Amino acid sequence: MKRGKKYRAAVARYDRAERFSLDRAVGLLKEVRYASFDETVEVHVSLRLKKNQTVRDTVVLPHRFRAEVRVLVFCKEDRVSEALAAGAAYAGGAEYLEKVKGGWFDFDVVVASPDMMKDVGRLGMVLGRRGLMPNPRTGTVSADLGAAVCELKKGRVEFRADKTGVVHLAVGKTTMDSAQIVENVDVFLSEMDRKKPVDVKAGFVRSISLSSSMGPGIWVVHKSEE
């Protein structure tokens, strides 16, 4: 893939083979950025996983950077007010099931009470391919609707390893304070370490890199190597 002049100039400002401390990597990412818009900062973590293993969970990042999250809650009528009071944009049962079935997607994340999952499951093909299907493992199927919605509104995000064993997660914006980006990355990495498969003894993390939307990747030293 041919890269533009600005990208090549950014790459020339540091040794791409070198691995930096997290603090320095974030600072360097800001130094070499060249885009005219507020880019998203992403962390990419390559994991040592067996073919039958995966990593999937959620984490609440301490510093929010996304636009307000629109939460749709599937629940019985007697729990609608509870969900809305917690901050859900929409809450209900049959009405919203039909709207989604008809192609309505004016929301960012879906929460469901356990007693609604039989009905929500019928939307598996519709919600699943968009990554919106509620799942107990990610806290989006919950009897405590208020807590589930509040966590999402506070900035809880899902992370999962792809087929190659790499986890990609947005952790900030380039205009954020560097310390906030560093803390978001630290919290995410700590949470991911806690979720590693039990039979992985050492070397769980192969490599870590940071990048902005348009910028080059910057290798980061994992804390176990510091």
Swiss-Prot record:
GO cellular component: large ribosomal subunit
GO biological process: regulation of translation; translation
Native source species: Treponema pallidum (strain Nichols)
Protein purpose: Binds directly to 23S rRNA. The L1 stalk is quite mobile in the ribosome, and is involved in E site tRNA release.
Family of the protein in this entry: Belongs to the universal ribosomal protein uL1 family.
Subunit structure: Part of the 50S ribosomal subunit.
Name the record gives this protein: Large ribosomal subunit protein uL1
Keywords tagged on the record: Repressor, Ribonucleoprotein, Ribosomal protein, RNA-binding, rRNA-binding, Translation regulation, tRNA-binding
Annotated GO MF terms: rRNA binding; structural constituent of ribosome; tRNA binding
Record flagged with keyword tRNA-binding: yes
